[in-house]
Amino acid sequence: PADFRKAKYQPKPELQYPDVYKQKPLKAIMHQRVGWYVSKGGILLATGNYGVALDRKDDPNDGNGIGRVVREVKKDGSLGPIYFIYYNHGFNEKNTAYPNYRKASKAVRAACEEILANPRYRMQWVEEADRGEKLIPVNNGYKAYCDYTLPDGRIASLWKHALTSLSLDGGNTYTTTNRALGFVNSNAKIWGQRLSDGTYATVYNPSEYRWPLGISLSGDGLEYKTLNLICGEVPPMRYGGNYKSRGPQYVRGIQEGNGVPKDS
């Protein structure tokens, strides 16, 4: 066994740089608000958008990227080929590194078609997609879309800054967007979903910063009556970079239609 008494403590620097900084110059940086999709046929797809950020003035989610790609995650954990499912302006199958999803297997093509037919899933592409993209139902600059279904079938939608809206037609159109009363939140994602007992929860940063992380509960998905702490710590920032914020933030759950795990 190792003798830890002889080990010398060597503190690591607070800021560490990932391997990407040691590689050759790259053409794109991955950005995604949504990373997974489970098809009706049981196909698991990983997805992300290739953005371009060459300088501090660039954002990987400014609508000026290359496009969104998908690849199958197989049951043994191996990965299938990469395919483009969406192209930003100026890009197509002829000037990109991977083929279009129409050249994938029948099962993967069907899964991609499900995504393209799902307005609630496409809404999560709004930041990376072209500005004014017709595929996006609400293309007005709001960020970090999230939604869940109410008992009466309406879709309750959430964005950053506690912006909320309702959809009466499954996500194709939405009511006027308003800021939720009493919902303290600034520039960070809010995640909301229906729980296994039929109640609802939102997980977010109830402050003007990206800490602490809290959870609020609701019986009907519209009126939230509790607020409890999940994490109040602000760990040191290990990696430097542009648009980095401290604190526990950008929580996601499992979106509707992608399965419901058993309660522990």
Feature-to-residue mapping (PLM):
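Asp-box/BNR beta-propeller blade signature and adjacent active/binding-site loops
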Residues: P1-S264
